[in-house]
Amino acid sequence: MKKDNIDFGKEFDWGKASIDYAKYRDIYPDEFYNKIIGLGYCKENQKVLDLATGTGVLPRNMYKFGAKWIGVDIAENQIKYAKLLSKDFDINYIVSPVENLEFEENSFDVVTACQCFMYFDKNILIPKIHKWLKPNGHFLIMFMDWLPYESEIAYKSEELVLKYNPLWSGKGSTRYEIKTPDWLGNMFTVSNKTAFDIDVNFTRDTWHGRIKACRGIGTGALSEKEISKWE
């Protein structure tokens, strides 16, 4: 994958990070999932499409709430691990760019995009999501990030990533106001904007794994030799 506005156009492939992604990026605490359920989404008798599902973190962890899930990802290796980790669940996974997906009208109650919306071609995808959603359906855009200016460990970790990959643009996140997106048009209205803090605990090993599985390190951004130096 290559995006001009991400990492200055440097190519990356999440499938190359799948081993570490599967092991170290299933980090959302129960509070995160309970917040989604509390808002009335992804629950029993709903059909949900998870875009850029990765290793199926969202469908796997929310399966217990009773929704019927489909997860899609562009990276075949991500879907390979999603299927392995979902072997006890009735979750359907598809390998495809999200922009190439085709579903019938009114197919889903909810469409989710977690940690991924910036990668999509919105001109293609947004009309499709509008078509796929049932009347009164919902499109959830979710994002969780560390705050380097509030955590010395996060700040130093970003410095180390940038030492070996100065083109990485995933740095420097701060708290910000959730603005109404300009792509809404007459297709969507905003029903909820929510921001909250969550404490996520890491060991030395799990934090190392989480950073290695970020776009700046493990997605083909660095060679094996460069990764060894970073480690």
Language-model regions, residue ranges each:
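Conserved class I S-adenosyl-L-methionine
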Residues: M1-K43
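Class I SAM-dependent methyltransferase SAM/SAH-binding core
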Residues: L49, T55-N100
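A short acidic, Gly/Pro-enriched loop at the edge of an enzyme's catalytic core
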Residues: L101-V110
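A short beta-strand submotif of the Rossmann-like class I SAM-dependent methyltransferase core
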Residues: A113-C114, K122
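A short, conserved alpha-helix within the catalytic core of class I
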Residues: F120-I129
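Conserved catalytic/acceptor-binding region of the Class I
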Residues: H130, K134-V200
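C-terminal helical/coil "lid" or tail adjacent to the Rossmann-like core of SAM-dependent
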Residues: S191-E231
